[in-house]
Amino acid sequence: MKQLTLAKTVKGVGIGLHKGEPIEITLEPLEANSGIVFFRSDLNASYKASPENVINTQMATVLGDDRGFISTIEHLMSAINAYGIDNVRIVLNANEAPVMDGSSISFCMMLDEAEVKELDAPKKIMVIKKPVEVRDGNKFVRLTPTKEPRINYTIKFDNAVIGEQSYNFEFSKKNYIENIARARTFGFLKDVQALRSMNLALGGSLENTIVVDENRILNPEGLRFKDEFVRHKILDAIGDLTLLGYRVFGDYISYAGSHHLNHLLTKEVLKDKDAYEIVSLEKTTQKAYEKVFA
């Protein structure tokens, strides 16, 4: 099984969730073993997608350094993971990725347009060898060894509309596109004023966010899935784990997880060299793992 990049460059435009300004995005092919690289064209600054370059996880996953930052990368990273793309350059002319419709389906469409290209190098994956867990009170995220990677996610909100939701996701591109990619980000009406006073969520609207009041959803079209909230959390988690630099072959289990806990989990994994193994998918080893990339 070979590493993948894009067959051609594709461009798109969307609104930034937090600043509310138009953003141009370009996805470009990269050579083997380059990984996922973000480039701020307005700053002439590159940022490798990796846990060590994460500087904030409050409202989104943010890469950066003293030159600047790039926010809200998780939806795009999630789509890149689902398509099995190992090497890609993401060019942005602003400090965040566009929110599109609040899900990752627009990025999936861009990747469909770009198509994928095999490179002359074996694909590598990260195989989890022993359990790794991060906790914050009763909230936790955990990676454990497995023969068939799954995500088991539970959320619990003190809100009648959301309440407690659980979802089990088994990795495959087809499953992702059908059941995860269209799940939108969500927020609460009561938080909007406070966020905007901090210059956040200025681009948020019913076009790109599920807005929840105390006992109703304000979006006139309603939900895309009855459990869209937990499905979006899975979308986010896939994007956050992609910062490890490889498709992760392990069970991810979360109760009330977050970008912050996901970030701590990726750091915890990398801290313990016995917790994982990087496996090169040569012909002799790929059969056990190829289902994940179907």
Curated annotation (Swiss-Prot):
Task: Spell out where the chain crosses the membrane.
Answer: none
Species source reads Campylobacter jejuni subsp. jejuni serotype O:23/36 (strain 81-176)
**Pathway annotation from the record:** Glycolipid biosynthesis; lipid IV(A) biosynthesis; lipid IV(A) from (3R)-3-hydroxytetradecanoyl-[acyl-carrier-protein] and UDP-N-acetyl-alpha-D-glucosamine: step 2/6
Keyword vocabulary terms for this entry: Hydrolase, Lipid A biosynthesis, Lipid biosynthesis, Lipid metabolism, Metal-binding, Zinc
Under catalytic activity, the entry for this protein gives: a UDP-3-O-[(3R)-3-hydroxyacyl]-N-acetyl-alpha-D-glucosamine + H2O = a UDP-3-O-[(3R)-3-hydroxyacyl]-alpha-D-glucosamine + acetate
Tell me which residues bind Zn(2+).
Answer: H75, H232, D236
- SUPFAM superfamilies for this protein: Ribosomal protein S5 domain 2-like
Protein name listed in UniProt: UDP-3-O-acyl-N-acetylglucosamine deacetylase
GO CC terms, sorted: membrane
